[in-house]
Each structure stands twice: as C-alpha cells, then as structure tokens.
Amino acid sequence: MKPHIVARINGEPFALVQHDVRLELRTPGRANLTTKSPSALRGLVTLDLGYNDKALHRHFVGYVERCTTANSQEQVLLCREVAAVLDYPLPMALRHVDLRAVLVEVSRVTGLRFRVPDAPYARVRVPYFYSLGGGVQAMDSLAQVFNIPDFIWHQQGDGEVFVGRWADSYWGVRPALQLPVELFDGYQGNHSAEIASLPGLRPGAMINQGQRITAVTLTGTQMVLKWKKP
C-alpha cells in the first residue's frame, strides 16, 4: 500500500513532488520539500500521513525557513519544526521558580506551547534559573536543575512540546509497539533500520524489546528508524 500524504501551507493543500522529513528527540525537526508551485511559498507547513481511508496522523508542524525556485513550476522548501525557535539565543535569569514557571517564560518569548505532566518534579521550586545560551541549551539544562530522571523534551504531532520524564510522556504510558520482523526492509547497523511508513510513529516511541526511537526519517514511502536501549 502507498501512504497518503497531505501537505498544507497556511491551511491550503499543495502537491508534493518529493519529501525528506527528519524528526529527532531533543532537536527540532526539519523537512526538505519539493512542491508544485510557480511562485514562492511562505508560512505554516503541516504534513499528515495515513493509509487508505484511515485517519490521518499529523507528522510535521513547522514553517518555511527558505524557499528556492527549482524551475518554472516547482519550489524547493526548507522547513523547520516550530520548536526551531529554540535555536536562537534565549537569556533568562529567574528567581524562585518551578518547571512550569520556567516554561511560561520560554513560551512568552518564543510563542511555543508546552505540555508538562503532573509529577513531583514539576512542582519543585529552585532558588534561581539562569541561562545565557540558546533555547536548546536552556531546555537541556532543565534535567539537572529540576533533577528529572530519564529527561526528554520534543515537539509532538500537535505542535506542543512535551517536557519531562520519558515515562510520563505519551509513549511512556503505552506498551511497546510490536513491529513484525517482516516489516523491516533492511538494517543499517545495530541501531537503525528501514521500514514501510507507519503513520503516528515518532521519536520517543518504544518498539519490540524496549528499543526507544530517537530519530525518524520519512522519505517517499519509507521510514528510517534509529533507536537506543534506555
């Protein structure tokens, strides 16, 4: 079966010629899209993936960072997930804050929406939170500042950014996905393989014997998965 991919810019569908979409844990994803369009394109980009008449799953939410004209009828788009705003400098000096208060400030500056579980570490207050680097560095530092075990942060399919312990995430509260051996088209080392596209599969998912997906690359009708043992 061939997957059904629906691509939109600012809510309007557009024809895809080819696509390469790369999602990772703790790093904003990116997409290279070639589209049918005689003129340059800008704005919010979404990609939904599904099979036949099944419900579509949102695979990518981002924006056009750069548009290059390939020929008179095609444009090449370099897109980033909305969380890519965290690549920019994000200095902060906050006093007497908990995890949610830090993320409220990040949201105020970046416009991002965060999802934080109702867990003890989310209620711990620290004397100060200090960061002079970029947003990614600030997000990574949350694990140590708030003593969060098995910490992850990543953009979800709905555009929100989950922040917390992996076990409290969408995938952490679900059993491992059992992917049959025949689904894998080829292994690329001990921690990577190519499979037919699976709608809804994203970094953070756990498969088979506890392997945790760290990266998903969607190209054409195939996905390349990378994983690690936690």
Label each PLM-derived region with a short phrase:
Residues 178-211:
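A conserved acidic, glycine/proline-rich C-terminal tail/linker
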Residues 1-84, 190, 195, 213-226, ...:
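Assembly/oligomerization scaffold segments
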